[in-house]
Amino acid sequence: MRFAIPLGAACAWAGVALAALQIAEDFSSITLNNDRFKAVWSKSKGSVVDMFLDGQDLLGPQSGSTGIGPYLDCYCVPSGFYTAGATNPRMQYVEGTDSTGTKYAGVILNDTYTPTGQQFQQYWFLRDGETGLHMFSRLAYYNETTPFLRNLQEFRTLFRPNTQLWTHLTSSELQTAPLPSKNAVSKQVVVQDATWRFNNTPDDAYYTQFSEYFTKYTFSNQWRDNDVHGLYGDGTNSNGSTYGAWLVMNTKGPLHSDLTVDGIVYNYIVSNHHGEGTPNITNGFDRTFGPQFYLFNGGKGSTSSLQDLRSEAAKLADPSWNAEFYDSIAKHVVGYVPSSKRGSVDGRIKLPKGASNPIAILTVDGQYFQDNSVVPSSYQYWTDIDTSGRFRIDRVVEGKYRLTVYADGIFGDFVRDGVTVRAGKTTTVKEKWDAESAGKEIWRLGTPDKSSGEFRHGVARDPTHPLHPPEYLIYWGAYDWQSDFPKGIDYTIGSSDPATDFNTVHWSVFGPTPDNPNVEYNTTHDWKINFSLTKKQLRNSKKATLTIQLAGAKTASGNTDEYKASEPYINLIHESYINDQKEPLSFVIGFNQSSSCIVRSAVSCYQVRSRMEFPADWLKVGENTLTLHLPYNATDTETAILPATVYVQYDALRLELD
């Protein structure tokens, strides 16, 4: 192996042939190409600036930050955004043959942000016979003078084309649509941060088929469900040949969700749009993220459909895919852990009755699984559990982990700390999950599945457009609270329908929206749940327990986890009143538990829950009422064009008697 060295003035061009794989370098660029795929890196930009599949230009002309990529940027310097390579990009290439006998070549960007000393590395690798780029991204910070810098708020790579080649975008079967036309974009109306209305171009294909509104959040997706996302060209602008550009999510994910594609194909490595925690950048921070794979398929003469090209990409969404190759290039990638330092976990857990869709998660020992980032060096892994309770997770970096299991239909999680993984070994786990219980369940509202999607304007499909996207993905302002619930929420257990009579979000304030300038305060903040109890149910009962699980909540901190003493609702108090009791059952949603959830088209974000006990004699035979209360007209100061109201999104509620 060798690293490229700067070329002297007498040698302006050098090419190195590796059978079908070729490397070329001059003063301004490095080029990698094989029989079908070619990528060109600009040494001055630190990014891919040209890309071709079978001779077809995949990026289009460079214009500012478009027509380039994949490239690395972040929201991680004191001033905010930074694009790796913007200060002093130093580019080099590597080459070799992996353990399978396949030739490879790689390009490595090194850049240091001078004001703080933050070090960025971006790696791109091309293998012979493949039409895509394997990528790793690294950030390091060593600074004893300023040991705490800030949080790593966003860390992402972007494939950002500037061409009419691409005609459709897709992040799932439900989230597939034509790209809005240039005409629609030129006449769009801003309604919210990164959200537009196309009412001026009602004949546009996106409008007629998918939605009147477009936002990058519409195509966000949970990592657990996201194998692949990207762009498709249907041949309209490529002489009939079809093309695909995909980010293969070969590590998948549990509850984390974020942007996937909006004309840009994203790899969101670290982010907090939907309330996930982000790691702090402190002295000694040094993380390498990856691998991820950008695949480009179809090509000259291809007639493959979007679904066909997407399925081809999805077959690669497997953590074991190309493991031998990654081990071979580990010597080039600072911080990548090879297979020799990984082990496996083989488990079987007896699940509670009624559990469905169970998942096993390994995260940092001793912490709630959604708080994995509190230890910046931590790893996480997850896999679905089969119907017999068995699961296996391979390629786990050696160390000590917490095992968390959750399932649809079951309140609470199963947690076990101290699961130790050793390199080259298999750790066996055998457990029984006894579902939490505080007595006899009297009623439940909603399905405990860490989502508020079963309620109104959640996962229900939009009936007004032929592609029928789920309603929650569109834009919260497409719906009108006053029309849906003119008298507020007055729900009766046993007779009301959760899909229509209980909203997917409990607002303190609603509005205005594009079609309704009015702001509603009076019917939003108090919700009533009515239920009947019999003498038999109450007999000998001393204690009652109300469990409330939230799929997301927004306090005055939004999605930043930042404490602002000037904001009265930085910590949000949720209150529940039983019948005519003056004292509520209360729990606090902390500033560091807040999400920007429904306003960014999500029904599952950072989870918050509380189990509250109260005397059974607060209840009575016959009709009872539970009032769910948020502060009246509770708002914050928004710096972006977003609703200022606080809100919560219910996953499920349950009443038990003992």
UniProtKB/Swiss-Prot annotation:
InterPro entries: Carb-bd-like_fold, Gal_mutarotase_sf_dom, Galactose-bd-like_sf, GH-type_carb-bd, Polysacch_Lyase_4, RG-lyase_II, RG-lyase_III. It catalyses: Endotype eliminative cleavage of L-alpha-rhamnopyranosyl-(1->4)-alpha-D-galactopyranosyluronic acid bonds of rhamnogalacturonan I domains in ramified hairy regions of pectin leaving L-rhamnopyranose at the reducing end and 4-deoxy-4,5-unsaturated D-galactopyranosyluronic acid at the non-reducing end. Its EC number is 4.2.2.23. One of its GO terms (molecular function) is rhamnogalacturonan endolyase activity. Keywords: Carbohydrate metabolism, Cell wall biogenesis/degradation, Glycoprotein, Lyase, Polysaccharide degradation, Secreted, Signal. The keyword Protein biosynthesis does not apply. GO terms for cellular component: extracellular region. SUPFAM superfamilies: Galactose mutarotase-like, Galactose-binding domain-like, Starch-binding domain-like. The keyword Transcription does not apply. It is found in: Secreted. GO terms for biological process: cell wall organization; polysaccharide catabolic process. PANTHER family: RHAMNOGALACTURONATE LYASE B, RHAMNOGALACTURONATE LYASE FAMILY PROTEIN. Pectinolytic enzymes consist of four classes of enzymes: pectin lyase, polygalacturonase, pectin methylesterase and rhamnogalacturonase. Degrades the rhamnogalacturonan I (RG-I) backbone of pectin. Belongs to the polysaccharide lyase 4 family. This is Probable rhamnogalacturonate lyase B. It comes from Aspergillus fumigatus (strain ATCC MYA-4609 / CBS 101355 / FGSC A1100 / Af293).
